[in-house]
Amino acid sequence: AAKRQKRAHQTRLLLVVFLAMLLVAGSLAYCEFWLWRPPGEGPAGPKVPRSAFDRPWSTRPVLLVGLGDSITAGFGVSESHGYFGRLAENPKDEWPDMKGICLREVLPKFGTLNLAVSGSTSLEHVEHISKRLEKQDPTVFGIVVMTTGGNDLIHSYGRSPPKEGAMYGATLKTAAPWIEAFEKRLDRMIGMIQDRFPGGCHLFLGDIYDPTDGVGDGEGAGLPPWPDGLKILDRYNGVIHAASSRRPGVSVVPIRAAFLGHGIHCAQFWREHYRSEDPTYWYGTNLEDPNARGYDAIRRLFLIEMVKVKDAM
Protein backbone atom coordinates (compact mmCIF):
# COMPACT_ATOMS: atom_id res chain seq x y z
CA ALA A 1 0.00 0.00 0.00
CA ALA A 2 2.85 2.36 0.84
CA LYS A 3 4.46 1.68 -2.55
CA ARG A 4 1.17 2.38 -4.37
CA GLN A 5 0.78 5.66 -2.48
CA LYS A 6 4.35 6.64 -3.35
CA ARG A 7 3.78 5.86 -7.05
CA ALA A 8 0.52 7.81 -7.03
CA HIS A 9 2.27 10.77 -5.42
CA GLN A 10 5.06 10.64 -8.01
CA THR A 11 2.50 10.43 -10.82
CA ARG A 12 0.63 13.44 -9.49
CA LEU A 13 3.89 15.35 -9.13
CA LEU A 14 4.91 14.53 -12.70
CA LEU A 15 1.47 15.59 -13.91
CA VAL A 16 1.73 18.90 -12.06
CA VAL A 17 5.21 19.50 -13.50
CA PHE A 18 4.00 18.63 -17.00
CA LEU A 19 1.01 20.95 -16.73
CA ALA A 20 3.23 23.73 -15.39
CA MET A 21 5.62 23.29 -18.32
CA LEU A 22 2.68 23.28 -20.70
CA LEU A 23 1.36 26.49 -19.15
CA VAL A 24 4.75 28.18 -19.40
CA ALA A 25 5.19 27.06 -23.01
CA GLY A 26 1.70 28.26 -23.88
CA SER A 27 2.31 31.61 -22.24
CA LEU A 28 5.60 32.07 -24.06
CA ALA A 29 3.98 31.11 -27.36
CA TYR A 30 1.16 33.58 -26.76
CA CYS A 31 3.64 36.35 -26.03
CA GLU A 32 5.80 35.40 -29.01
CA PHE A 33 2.99 35.39 -31.57
CA TRP A 34 0.47 37.87 -30.16
CA LEU A 35 2.17 40.40 -27.87
CA TRP A 36 5.81 40.77 -28.91
CA ARG A 37 6.27 42.91 -31.99
CA PRO A 38 10.00 43.19 -32.64
CA PRO A 39 10.98 46.41 -34.44
CA GLY A 40 14.12 44.81 -35.82
CA GLU A 41 17.38 46.52 -36.68
CA GLY A 42 19.08 47.84 -39.78
CA PRO A 43 17.63 49.14 -43.04
CA ALA A 44 14.04 48.41 -44.03
CA GLY A 45 12.17 48.37 -47.29
CA PRO A 46 13.06 47.76 -50.94
CA LYS A 47 16.33 48.55 -52.65
CA VAL A 48 16.54 51.85 -54.53
CA PRO A 49 18.51 51.71 -57.81
CA ARG A 50 21.80 53.51 -57.16
CA SER A 51 22.44 54.02 -60.86
CA ALA A 52 19.54 56.49 -60.98
CA PHE A 53 21.54 58.84 -58.74
CA ASP A 54 24.77 58.88 -60.74
CA ARG A 55 23.98 62.14 -62.55
CA PRO A 56 21.75 65.22 -62.03
CA TRP A 57 18.05 64.93 -62.75
CA SER A 58 17.53 68.61 -63.50
CA THR A 59 19.36 71.93 -63.44
CA ARG A 60 16.15 73.83 -62.69
CA PRO A 61 15.30 75.16 -59.23
CA VAL A 62 13.34 72.39 -57.53
CA LEU A 63 11.25 72.67 -54.36
CA LEU A 64 10.36 69.57 -52.34
CA VAL A 65 7.06 70.24 -50.56
CA GLY A 66 5.54 68.07 -47.84
CA LEU A 67 1.78 68.13 -47.26
CA GLY A 68 -0.65 66.16 -45.16
CA ASP A 69 -0.54 64.44 -41.81
CA SER A 70 1.92 63.16 -39.23
CA ILE A 71 3.51 60.60 -41.55
CA THR A 72 4.85 63.40 -43.73
CA ALA A 73 5.46 65.59 -40.67
CA GLY A 74 7.69 62.80 -39.29
CA PHE A 75 5.98 62.32 -35.94
CA GLY A 76 7.97 60.23 -33.48
CA VAL A 77 11.44 60.63 -34.97
CA SER A 78 13.95 63.42 -35.48
CA GLU A 79 13.49 65.71 -38.48
CA SER A 80 16.41 64.10 -40.30
CA HIS A 81 14.98 60.59 -39.86
CA GLY A 82 11.43 61.15 -41.07
CA TYR A 83 10.76 60.10 -44.64
CA PHE A 84 10.64 63.75 -45.78
CA GLY A 85 14.02 64.51 -44.24
CA ARG A 86 15.55 61.35 -45.67
CA LEU A 87 14.19 62.15 -49.13
CA ALA A 88 15.93 65.50 -49.04
CA GLU A 89 19.32 64.36 -47.77
CA ASN A 90 21.00 61.48 -46.02
CA PRO A 91 21.26 61.70 -42.23
CA LYS A 92 24.73 61.37 -40.72
CA ASP A 93 24.03 57.77 -39.69
CA GLU A 94 22.60 56.73 -43.06
CA TRP A 95 22.63 53.04 -43.96
CA PRO A 96 25.48 52.10 -46.33
CA ASP A 97 23.11 51.03 -49.11
CA MET A 98 21.48 54.49 -49.16
CA LYS A 99 24.47 56.81 -48.87
CA GLY A 100 24.39 59.22 -51.79
CA ILE A 101 20.80 58.30 -52.65
CA CYS A 102 18.73 61.41 -51.94
CA LEU A 103 17.29 64.34 -53.85
CA ARG A 104 19.99 66.81 -52.89
CA GLU A 105 22.54 64.59 -54.67
CA VAL A 106 20.78 64.92 -58.04
CA LEU A 107 19.19 68.38 -57.82
CA PRO A 108 21.82 71.14 -57.55
CA LYS A 109 19.22 73.92 -57.06
CA PHE A 110 17.16 72.27 -54.37
CA GLY A 111 15.00 73.55 -51.51
CA THR A 112 12.50 72.09 -49.05
CA LEU A 113 9.23 73.17 -47.44
CA ASN A 114 7.36 70.81 -45.13
CA LEU A 115 3.83 72.03 -44.37
CA ALA A 116 2.49 68.73 -43.00
CA VAL A 117 0.73 68.83 -39.61
CA SER A 118 0.53 65.92 -37.19
CA GLY A 119 -3.00 64.79 -36.37
CA SER A 120 -4.58 66.61 -39.31
CA THR A 121 -7.30 65.19 -41.57
CA SER A 122 -8.02 65.65 -45.25
CA LEU A 123 -10.62 68.29 -44.38
CA GLU A 124 -7.83 70.37 -42.84
CA HIS A 125 -5.41 69.65 -45.67
CA VAL A 126 -7.60 71.60 -48.07
CA GLU A 127 -7.26 74.59 -45.77
CA HIS A 128 -3.52 74.11 -45.33
CA ILE A 129 -2.91 74.06 -49.08
CA SER A 130 -5.21 77.01 -49.67
CA LYS A 131 -3.68 79.24 -47.00
CA ARG A 132 -0.07 78.08 -46.60
CA LEU A 133 1.20 76.89 -49.97
CA GLU A 134 2.18 79.99 -51.92
CA LYS A 135 2.30 80.25 -55.68
CA GLN A 136 5.83 79.59 -56.88
CA ASP A 137 7.96 81.32 -59.48
CA PRO A 138 7.51 79.85 -62.99
CA THR A 139 11.17 78.80 -62.98
CA VAL A 140 10.56 76.43 -60.05
CA PHE A 141 9.57 72.79 -60.46
CA GLY A 142 7.72 71.22 -57.55
CA ILE A 143 8.18 67.74 -56.14
CA VAL A 144 5.22 67.39 -53.79
CA VAL A 145 4.80 64.50 -51.34
CA MET A 146 1.55 64.02 -49.45
CA THR A 147 -0.10 61.55 -47.08
CA THR A 148 -3.77 62.23 -46.48
CA GLY A 149 -6.90 60.39 -45.38
CA GLY A 150 -5.50 58.08 -42.72
CA ASN A 151 -6.65 60.21 -39.82
CA ASP A 152 -10.09 60.53 -41.43
CA LEU A 153 -10.43 56.81 -40.75
CA ILE A 154 -8.77 56.15 -37.41
CA HIS A 155 -10.01 59.19 -35.48
CA SER A 156 -11.45 59.19 -32.86
CA TYR A 157 -10.50 55.58 -32.13
CA GLY A 158 -14.10 54.61 -31.35
CA ARG A 159 -14.32 56.99 -28.39
CA SER A 160 -17.12 59.01 -30.01
CA PRO A 161 -19.78 58.37 -32.66
CA PRO A 162 -18.31 58.26 -36.19
CA LYS A 163 -18.50 61.36 -38.35
CA GLU A 164 -16.79 62.77 -41.41
CA GLY A 165 -13.11 63.22 -40.62
CA ALA A 166 -13.35 60.82 -37.64
CA MET A 167 -14.95 57.70 -39.08
CA TYR A 168 -13.74 54.92 -36.77
CA GLY A 169 -16.61 52.50 -36.18
CA ALA A 170 -18.77 53.63 -39.12
CA THR A 171 -20.63 51.22 -41.37
CA LEU A 172 -19.87 51.29 -45.07
CA LYS A 173 -23.36 52.64 -45.73
CA THR A 174 -22.89 55.49 -43.27
CA ALA A 175 -19.43 56.27 -44.65
CA ALA A 176 -20.46 56.26 -48.33
CA PRO A 177 -21.16 60.02 -48.59
CA TRP A 178 -17.96 60.79 -46.67
CA ILE A 179 -15.95 58.69 -49.11
CA GLU A 180 -17.55 60.52 -52.02
CA ALA A 181 -16.71 63.84 -50.36
CA PHE A 182 -13.09 62.69 -49.90
CA GLU A 183 -12.85 61.98 -53.63
CA LYS A 184 -14.02 65.50 -54.47
CA ARG A 185 -11.77 66.99 -51.79
CA LEU A 186 -8.71 65.13 -53.05
CA ASP A 187 -9.36 66.26 -56.60
CA ARG A 188 -9.63 69.83 -55.35
CA MET A 189 -6.37 69.51 -53.42
CA ILE A 190 -4.53 68.19 -56.46
CA GLY A 191 -5.86 71.06 -58.54
CA MET A 192 -4.73 73.64 -55.98
CA ILE A 193 -1.27 72.07 -55.73
CA GLN A 194 -0.80 72.13 -59.49
CA ASP A 195 -2.02 75.73 -59.67
CA ARG A 196 0.69 76.73 -57.18
CA PHE A 197 3.40 75.56 -59.58
CA PRO A 198 3.02 77.35 -62.93
CA GLY A 199 6.42 75.92 -63.85
CA GLY A 200 5.14 72.37 -63.35
CA CYS A 201 5.14 69.84 -60.54
CA HIS A 202 4.71 66.17 -59.79
CA LEU A 203 2.66 64.94 -56.84
CA PHE A 204 3.59 61.71 -55.07
CA LEU A 205 0.59 60.59 -53.06
CA GLY A 206 0.98 57.86 -50.47
CA ASP A 207 -1.88 55.44 -49.95
CA ILE A 208 -3.08 54.42 -46.48
CA TYR A 209 -1.54 51.49 -44.65
CA ASP A 210 -3.31 48.85 -42.57
CA PRO A 211 -1.76 48.09 -39.15
CA THR A 212 -3.89 44.92 -38.88
CA ASP A 213 -2.06 43.28 -41.81
CA GLY A 214 -5.29 42.65 -43.70
CA VAL A 215 -7.02 40.94 -40.76
CA GLY A 216 -9.20 43.89 -39.79
CA ASP A 217 -9.07 43.27 -36.05
CA GLY A 218 -8.49 46.68 -34.51
CA GLU A 219 -9.18 45.11 -31.14
CA GLY A 220 -5.83 43.34 -31.50
CA ALA A 221 -4.29 46.78 -31.02
CA GLY A 222 -6.56 47.73 -28.15
CA LEU A 223 -9.18 49.49 -30.27
CA PRO A 224 -12.92 48.70 -30.42
CA PRO A 225 -14.09 46.26 -33.11
CA TRP A 226 -14.83 47.83 -36.50
CA PRO A 227 -16.49 45.28 -38.80
CA ASP A 228 -16.49 47.51 -41.88
CA GLY A 229 -13.06 49.04 -41.26
CA LEU A 230 -11.21 47.25 -44.06
CA LYS A 231 -14.02 47.89 -46.54
CA ILE A 232 -13.88 51.62 -45.86
CA LEU A 233 -10.08 51.61 -45.98
CA ASP A 234 -10.22 49.90 -49.37
CA ARG A 235 -12.66 52.53 -50.66
CA TYR A 236 -10.43 55.37 -49.46
CA ASN A 237 -7.40 53.77 -51.08
CA GLY A 238 -9.43 53.26 -54.23
CA VAL A 239 -10.01 57.01 -54.35
CA ILE A 240 -6.29 57.67 -53.88
CA HIS A 241 -5.25 55.21 -56.58
CA ALA A 242 -7.80 56.62 -59.01
CA ALA A 243 -6.23 60.06 -58.59
CA SER A 244 -3.28 59.10 -60.80
CA SER A 245 -5.62 58.31 -63.69
CA ARG A 246 -7.81 61.38 -63.20
CA ARG A 247 -4.98 63.90 -63.47
CA PRO A 248 -1.53 63.91 -65.09
CA GLY A 249 1.51 64.48 -62.91
CA VAL A 250 0.31 62.29 -60.04
CA SER A 251 1.96 59.07 -58.83
CA VAL A 252 0.62 56.84 -56.07
CA VAL A 253 3.16 55.44 -53.62
CA PRO A 254 2.11 51.90 -52.53
CA ILE A 255 2.69 52.18 -48.78
CA ARG A 256 -0.13 49.81 -47.85
CA ALA A 257 1.23 46.88 -49.84
CA ALA A 258 4.76 47.38 -48.51
CA PHE A 259 3.60 47.52 -44.88
CA LEU A 260 1.40 44.39 -44.98
CA GLY A 261 3.11 41.87 -42.72
CA HIS A 262 4.78 44.57 -40.64
CA GLY A 263 1.77 45.39 -38.47
CA ILE A 264 0.32 43.90 -35.30
CA HIS A 265 0.48 40.34 -36.72
CA CYS A 266 4.08 40.56 -37.93
CA ALA A 267 5.23 37.59 -35.80
CA GLN A 268 2.44 35.22 -36.86
CA PHE A 269 3.96 32.93 -39.48
CA TRP A 270 0.62 31.47 -40.53
CA ARG A 271 -0.75 34.80 -41.78
CA GLU A 272 -1.14 35.53 -45.49
CA HIS A 273 1.21 38.51 -45.42
CA TYR A 274 3.90 37.09 -43.12
CA ARG A 275 7.33 38.41 -44.13
CA SER A 276 9.78 35.61 -43.42
CA GLU A 277 12.70 37.76 -44.65
CA ASP A 278 11.90 40.51 -42.13
CA PRO A 279 9.07 39.63 -39.68
CA THR A 280 9.26 42.94 -37.84
CA TYR A 281 7.00 45.77 -36.72
CA TRP A 282 7.22 49.04 -38.67
CA TYR A 283 4.74 51.09 -36.65
CA GLY A 284 5.21 53.39 -33.68
CA THR A 285 3.73 52.95 -30.24
CA ASN A 286 0.69 55.05 -31.22
CA LEU A 287 -0.16 52.67 -34.13
CA GLU A 288 -0.88 55.65 -36.43
CA ASP A 289 2.68 56.47 -37.41
CA PRO A 290 5.74 54.52 -38.52
CA ASN A 291 8.75 53.81 -36.35
CA ALA A 292 12.26 54.69 -37.55
CA ARG A 293 12.51 51.64 -39.81
CA GLY A 294 9.03 52.30 -41.16
CA TYR A 295 10.06 55.82 -42.15
CA ASP A 296 13.14 54.38 -43.85
CA ALA A 297 10.90 52.07 -45.90
CA ILE A 298 8.53 54.89 -46.85
CA ARG A 299 11.45 57.05 -47.99
CA ARG A 300 12.56 54.23 -50.29
CA LEU A 301 9.06 53.75 -51.70
CA PHE A 302 8.78 57.44 -52.58
CA LEU A 303 12.23 57.49 -54.18
CA ILE A 304 11.41 54.47 -56.34
CA GLU A 305 8.35 56.26 -57.71
CA MET A 306 10.39 59.43 -58.27
CA VAL A 307 13.00 57.52 -60.25
CA LYS A 308 10.27 56.37 -62.64
CA VAL A 309 9.43 59.95 -63.66
CA LYS A 310 12.76 61.73 -63.12
CA ASP A 311 13.28 62.40 -66.83
CA ALA A 312 10.13 64.57 -66.87
CA MET A 313 11.45 66.90 -64.17
Indicate where each model-derived feature is located:
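Catalytic His-Asp segment of secreted/periplasmic serine-dependent ester chemistry enzymes
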Residues: 208-313
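Serine-dependent acyl-ester chemistry module
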Residues: 73, 155-177, 210-234
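A structural motif corresponding to the C-terminal end of an alpha-helix
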Residues: 98-111, 185-202, 235-254, 305
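N-terminal secretory targeting modules
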Residues: 1-67, 71-91, 104-106, 139, ...
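Structural recognition of the beta-strand scaffold that forms the well-ordered cores
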Residues: 63-67, 72-74, 111-116, 142-147, ...
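Conserved SGNH/GDSL esterase-like catalytic core that processes O-acyl groups on lipids
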Residues: 77-184
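Short amphipathic alpha-helices and their capping/turn segments at secondary-structure boundaries
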Residues: 46-65, 125-144, 188-199, 303
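Short, amphipathic alpha-helical "lid/cap" segments that border enzyme active or binding sites
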Residues: 126, 179, 183, 187, ...
